[in-house]
Amino acid sequence: MSTDVTNSATNKISARIRMIAQVGMLAAIATVLMLFEIPLPFAPAFYEIDFSEVPILVGCFTMGPLAGAAIEFIKILLNFAINGTMTAGVGEIANFLIGCALVVPAGLIYKKMHSRKGAIIGMITGTVVMTFLGCFLNAYILLPTYAKAFEMPMDLSLIHI
């Protein structure tokens, strides 16, 4: 009886350690991928494409949406420690919120529909949520905060949603 309890406790600890190690490794991979950002043509300099969401999606699909959000957060912290910030933290907050808007819905749907179809539906849903949330956050919160932080004028009459 006591060996069953001991084995159960050991298995729980091993699973927790394995999850922490996986989160750390995926966050490190995402951070390295984030270093290779591609600027978008015809867009402001702070809009860039990076492939750092791929390992986060892998982690989200294998360990759940909470782990995906944790990987996203650690990636942002590591990138902040390596590169610092040129956006007074607004870009890092934007990256975290918009990244979570992609991976959390994808992870939640995949958790309910554990199949290739569920992964595809999750990624499509995550992309749609990320697009709408990104537009809203950029228009009403992030860009005004960025403009205020750098004392730049911003004409809010240009925003029509």
Residue ranges with predicted function:
Residues 1-159:
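Loop-helix junctions at membrane interfaces
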